[in-house]
Amino acid sequence: MNQSQPLSEYPRPQFKRDSYICLNGYWEYAIRKEEKIPAKFDGQILVPFSPEVSKSEVNKVVLPDDYLFYRLNLDLPSDFIKDKVILHFGAVDQIAEVFINDQFVMKHVGGFLPFEMDIKPFLKDGKGTLVVRVVDTTNASYHSSGKQHLKPEGIWYKPQSGIYMPVWLESVTMDVSKN
């Protein structure tokens, strides 16, 4: 595994485009009790591994009343940028809010499905600070949690929070098909 950019292969081979940037790798992270985006982060996390697993290099449990923050500075080559710059998340457990340059972009609820958004309007000359704020209520709410449990035993296993599937960018023209 490429430690600086794990799982860097294109995640959807049947839809491969020529404009692809893998964002897996080291991001900054913070775990806080407040929802405000922190000025100071706790360290680095290896995306796309949840903070609870050793591959993330964090090994911390995110509790239901915690906010997990990710931050990554983007500096996209000018020849990469087309009509739209699509940011893809393979999956984030469980509620994710995405910000670019301190502007709210979108909220996604559901820890098992991919989601995407056009971030070009939020970038400044291809540059931007990407922040993802995550809440994972695990088994403390009505949201699907699978077999995750805060007190794992028997068939239950420890929670997995945050980004746990690949993250990538694609730049496309306006006539792109969603099929």
Regions found by a protein language model. Name each.
Residues 57:
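N-terminal [4Fe-4S]-dependent radical SAM core
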